[in-house]
């Protein structure tokens, strides 16, 4: 094998490696993920280097049929993990519906919810067993509705 052939082979190999690594970092449409035994998996593709069939780790997103973003967040080993944001679908606008964190598929820490008009609706914390501590609920006109201790 000549020097030129080895050089071309090395470049092709590096490109394949780069494409394989980069594809794991790019956000994926969550509707393309496959749910199996409570975990989200990458769809099986013909290109083995993409990590097809593995529990998904990375950023994912969903869109409503209208094209408005529905959700965006990260998965770790097939479970929601990290920051997630959900949106309302309001007349083609993307109004935030809720923001919070997941740990191994469970909501944890501070979560904030908003009405479709953009006003805050509820604020509180989650632990793996559900809502905990003080939760504050608001009316759409910003007035306090109720405070509940869970």
Positions of predicted regions on the chain:
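Glycine/tyrosine- and acidic-biased, solvent-exposed loop/turn segments at the edges of beta-strands
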Residues: 19-150
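Bacterial N-terminal signal peptides
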Residues: 10-19
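Bacterial N-terminal signal peptides that target proteins for export
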Residues: 2-9
């Amino acid at each position: 094998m000549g020097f030129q052939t080895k050089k071309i082979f090395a470049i092709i190999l590096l490109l394949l490696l780069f494409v394989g690594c980069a594809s794991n970092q790019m956000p994926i449409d969550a509707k393309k993920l496959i749910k199996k035994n409570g975990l989200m998996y990458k769809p099986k593709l013909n290109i083995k280097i993409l990590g097809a069939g593995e529990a998904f780790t990375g950023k994912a997103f969903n869109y409503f049929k209208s094209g408005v973003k529905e959700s965006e967040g990260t998965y770790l080993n097939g479970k929601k993990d990290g920051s997630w944001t959900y949106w309302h679908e309001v007349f083609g606008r993307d109004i935030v519906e809720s923001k919070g964190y997941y740990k191994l598929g469970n909501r944890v820490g501070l979560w904030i919810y908003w009405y479709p008009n953009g006003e805050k609706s509820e604020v509180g914390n989650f632990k793996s067993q559900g809502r905990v501590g003080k939760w504050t609920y608001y009316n759409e006109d910003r007035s306090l509705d109720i405070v509940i201790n869970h």
